Amino acid sequence: MNISFEKFLECLSIFMHSFFVLLMVVMCGAYMSFVERRLLALFQNRYGPNRVGWNGSLQLLADLIKIMFKEDWIPPFSDRYIFVLAPAIAFIISLMIIPVIPFTPSSVILHCNVGVLFFLMISALTVYSVLLAGWSSNNKYALIGAVRSIAQTLSYEVFLGLSLMGIVAKSGSFDLLNIVQDQKYLWNIVPQFLGFVVFFISGMALCHRHPFDQPESEQELVAGYHIEYSGMKFSLFFISEYISVISISSFMVTLFFGGWYGPWFPPVVWFIIKTFMIVLFFVLIRASLPRPRYDYVMLVGWKFLLPIALLNLLVTAGYILI
């Protein structure tokens, strides 16, 4: 009886820890929208949201109240059940990456020996939510946006995977903990700079972040695959995108910037600081670059990123053999 009770307490502790981490990630994803709006206003020399609360700090609460009172409309011409299911799938998949990220040596929800492969597998699953949303909406703009998203995601998934093979070969492991510990004295961004460039660009494409937001380009497709969504369903897609940005940034810190390693501050503080700096860089790129044509996006991937990723893998293999 004592053993079963101890197991129950252990399971309860794991559940509460996991719930707290996921809740914090969701809140960070939501607040990232506010931070992005304020930073874009700063870059563009204008005022951002500054009316609700001190300097607009309660703008997220105002947006939440507004969204809750919006009509939860389902188009009569759509496939009702798939239409409702798609945003929930997008939200769940965006959260599935978080458990394998090692924030500190002891703060990891799910220790996976093949964490890199798990990340690649989950990031490829995002196409299903987009496909279901575009198809079930029964709208030509939504379907075109979904097709664009699928082609872009599957293409850049190839470059993303190849950019990580150099790190896997260098550290000799798919385990994220081992990869971080391998960077104790030298971060991977130094020997794997080409891989970092490919990973960063591919990560932006997988998150559909500007300038890779072709699936939802307003000038061409109005809103892309979520054109028919409103209220909380649209919010799930919206928050999922920001959670994906945080996930990609966290993996970038884990793989290239030494994870939790850093002087003076506790490990988790260093991890948060590094992740936040990369997220800020995502916002800076959105404020700086125009949106290219869709065919240019695909051309850059297959004509430039693929050779760079293969060159990085070849150089890494030569370094290991020498």
UniProtKB/Swiss-Prot annotation:
Reactions mediated catalytically: a quinone + NADH + 5 H(+)(in) = a quinol + NAD(+) + 4 H(+)(out)
Pfam families named among the record's database cross-references: NADHdh
GO molecular function, one term: quinone binding
Entry's Gene Ontology BP terms: aerobic respiration
Keyword Oxidoreductase: no
Subcellular location(s) per record: Cell inner membrane
PROSITE patterns membership: COMPLEX1_ND1_2
Topology versus the membrane: Multi-pass membrane protein
Annotated keywords: Cell inner membrane, Cell membrane, Membrane, NAD, Quinone, Translocase, Transmembrane, Transmembrane helix, Ubiquinone
Taxonomy, superkingdom: Bacteria
Regions crossing the membrane: 14-34, 81-101, 114-134, 149-169, 186-206, 237-257, 265-285, 302-322
Main location: membrane
EC annotation from Swiss-Prot or TrEMBL: 7.1.1.-
Quaternary structure and partners: NDH-1 is composed of 13 different subunits. Subunits NuoA, H, J, K, L, M, N constitute the membrane sector of the complex.
Protein purpose: NDH-1 shuttles electrons from NADH, via FMN and iron-sulfur (Fe-S) centers, to quinones in the respiratory chain. The immediate electron acceptor for the enzyme in this species is believed to be ubiquinone. Couples the redox reaction to proton translocation (for every two electrons transferred, four hydrogen ions are translocated across the cytoplasmic membrane), and thus conserves the redox energy in a proton gradient. This subunit may bind ubiquinone.
Similarity-based family: Belongs to the complex I subunit 1 family.
Protein name per the record: NADH-quinone oxidoreductase subunit H
Lineage: Bacteria, Pseudomonadati, Pseudomonadota, Gammaproteobacteria, Enterobacterales
Recorded name of the encoding gene: nuoH
